[in-house]
Structure formats: C-alpha cells, structure tokens
C-alpha cells in the first residue's frame, strides 16, 4: 500500500536522523510527473522554482509541495496535455497526475511521530 510506504519512509527518516545534527536541501527543479528515480520520465510540469533549505525535513517537504501547488504548469508534458487550457495555480498537481496517491498522509504521519512540523515560514533570499 502506498500509504504504508509513506509511513515507512517517515519512520526510516526519523531513525536515521535521531539525535544527529541535520540540515536538508531541496532543489525544486525539473519537477517531473513521475518519480525522478525512474529510468524514464516526461518533461517538467512547472518552471524551476529554486532551492529550499531547512533544519526541519517535514517543514521543507511541505513548503516545497506548496510551492509546486501554487506554481503554473508549463506546456509539453503529461499534465499540460490533460489540462490544456488551465494554468493550475493552487491545484494539487501531484494528485492530478496520480489520483490514487495521498502524499499528505506521509507528511501528517511524519509530524505525528515527531520527525518535524508541517508549519513553516518561507523566507526568500
């Protein structure tokens, strides 16, 4: 089950980070419709948004997801083909591409087990 996988990712992350100093960096670039771990993929669905960083991995993931949700889509990809006349700012692009997944459940669970908090303050530099 995908939900169980998301829960395990949170649990493994907590185990790795427990009692260790940590800092997290996300590159919000070339956001593709499939996992970037796949050996094939489609064109990026949004413009490059930059780099985000935090000591809190949950806040970082939530901030990055919100930035993707609020970004317009770009053409020439799977998402643009299914929504050709929409910019989709404010729409959950992850859910539009994969309606059977619930990425938010992983963040809620990560917060529940004490990995971090979904609350964040976005500071642009």
Show which residues each predicted segment covers:
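Extended, low-polarity segments enriched in aliphatic/aromatic residues
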Residues: 3-125
């Amino acid at each position: 089950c995908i939900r169980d996988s998301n829960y395990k990712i949170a649990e493994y992350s907590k185990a790795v980070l427990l009692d260790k100093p940590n800092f997290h960096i996300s590159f919000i670039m070339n956001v593709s419709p499939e996992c970037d771990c796949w050996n094939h993929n489609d064109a990026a669905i949004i413009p490059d948004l930059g780099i985000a960083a935090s000591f809190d991995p949950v806040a970082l993931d939530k901030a990055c997801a919100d930035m993707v949700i609020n970004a317009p889509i770009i053409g020439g990809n799977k998402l643009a083909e299914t929504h050709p006349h929409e910019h989709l700012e404010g729409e959950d692009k992850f859910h539009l591409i994969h309606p059977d997944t619930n990425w938010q459940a992983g963040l809620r669970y990560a917060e529940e087990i004490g990995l971090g908090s979904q609350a964040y303050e976005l500071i642009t530099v």
